[in-house]
Amino acid sequence: MHEYSIVQSLLESCEEHARANGAKKVTKVVVKIGVLSGVEPELLQTAFDTFKEKTICDSAEFSINIQKVEIFCNRCNANSTLQKNEFACPKCESVDIKVTDGEDMYLMSLELE
């Protein structure tokens, strides 16, 4: 489960941001997870709940936003959100596409006190 190592890095990042802003605790952590990121939201939630104890995020709420796959079609120049895992442009059906979102995980925001 690589979610544990992801959460450890996430908690370190939260601590760095809190320290840099003079905060004593983090009350909310918001992340965005792309459906192609390979990160399982349920496992990430479990890992966060496990590892946040005795950290600056001890009482933090953890919010996960799921990002669908967004593409740009090189043929018709359309931006689209894929509804299923069919990697073709929904407008012209070309497979000459570039994924523009939905592959990564990002720390979107922190609420600090």
Can you name each region flagged by the protein language model?
Residues M1-D58, S63:
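Long, charged N-terminal interaction/targeting segments
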Residues E61-V69, A78-Q83:
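Short, flexible, mixed-charge glycine/proline-rich loop motifs
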Residues I71, F87, M105:
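Cys/His-enriched microdomains
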Residues C73-C76, C89-C92:
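Short cysteine-rich clusters marking metal-coordination/redox-active sites
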Residues T81, I97-K98:
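Short functional micro-motifs and their immediate structural scaffolds
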Residues S94, D104:
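ATP/adenylate-binding site constellation spanning eukaryotic-like Ser/Thr protein kinases
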Residues S109-E113:
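Short hydrophobic/aromatic patches at helix-to-coil boundaries
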